[in-house]
């Protein structure tokens, strides 16, 4: 006997429950994370402390708000298993068995690639770009950067790297759906090169060419990796009844 389809009101009520539980999880996670903010702040400040520099704050609430921002981000990370589970419980009933299996298989890959992108960026590109930019003034100018501006710069720099590292996943999905192919990616490599540099210019937080080049390099590598992956993918349509 098939389950009775949910009404619009029941869907909205289920969505409301997902949002409430997710928000509570984020609040609890943020409260816990606030105790460890200084530890993570010291990690983010490595490029600055390596140059014997100190950051400043220029209004009364800036230091507190910056720490609160970091705590909320860490809280979201801590709460992510609960958030993902809530989202999954909401969307899974409307998916086919094959779709559920595919998504469950891809979620760990997506998380690993996102984290790998941020870690790679922080220990390579971010360190190099930040030190270069801070020393760019030479003896003529001395940097006086606020903690709020620095953290915003760091987040705007690192998060796009996590996102662009998802390129192989995007290509895998599109190839599975027979939207693109290995031949298509090879044929359009020159256009991809142009798109990569446009994306690098759009995603980097500053206008400097160095940051854009450091962003473009891994993007180009990821595109080549995606071409390699697409070569071995056989298009497959999702099938199966929704249960």
Swiss-Prot record:
<feature type="transmembrane region" description="Helical">
    <location>
        <begin position="106"/>
        <end position="126"/>
    </location>
</feature>
<dbReference type="GO" id="GO:0009977">
    <property type="term" value="F:proton motive force dependent protein transmembrane transporter activity"/>
</dbReference>
<protein>
    <recommendedName>
        <fullName>Sec-independent protein translocase protein TatC</fullName>
    </recommendedName>
</protein>
<keyword id="KW-0653">Protein transport</keyword>
<dbReference type="InterPro" id="IPR002033">
    <property type="entry name" value="TatC"/>
</dbReference>
<keyword id="KW-1003">Cell membrane</keyword>
<feature type="transmembrane region" description="Helical">
    <location>
        <begin position="18"/>
        <end position="38"/>
    </location>
</feature>
<dbReference type="GO" id="GO:0043953">
    <property type="term" value="P:protein transport by the Tat complex"/>
</dbReference>
<feature type="transmembrane region" description="Helical">
    <location>
        <begin position="70"/>
        <end position="90"/>
    </location>
</feature>
<dbReference type="Pfam" id="PF00902">
    <property type="entry name" value="TatC"/>
</dbReference>
<feature type="transmembrane region" description="Helical">
    <location>
        <begin position="153"/>
        <end position="173"/>
    </location>
</feature>
<feature type="transmembrane region" description="Helical">
    <location>
        <begin position="191"/>
        <end position="211"/>
    </location>
</feature>
<keyword id="KW-0813">Transport</keyword>
<dbReference type="GO" id="GO:0033281">
    <property type="term" value="C:TAT protein transport complex"/>
</dbReference>
<keyword id="KW-0472">Membrane</keyword>
<dbReference type="GO" id="GO:0065002">
    <property type="term" value="P:intracellular protein transmembrane transport"/>
</dbReference>
<keyword id="KW-1133">Transmembrane helix</keyword>
<feature type="transmembrane region" description="Helical">
    <location>
        <begin position="213"/>
        <end position="233"/>
    </location>
</feature>
<keyword id="KW-0811">Translocation</keyword>
<comment type="function">
    <text>Part of the twin-arginine translocation (Tat) system that transports large folded proteins containing a characteristic twin-arginine motif in their signal peptide across membranes.</text>
</comment>
<keyword id="KW-0812">Transmembrane</keyword>
<comment type="subunit">
    <text>Forms a complex with TatA.</text>
</comment>
<feature type="transmembrane region" description="Helical">
    <location>
        <begin position="132"/>
        <end position="152"/>
    </location>
</feature>
<comment type="similarity">
    <text>Belongs to the TatC family.</text>
</comment>
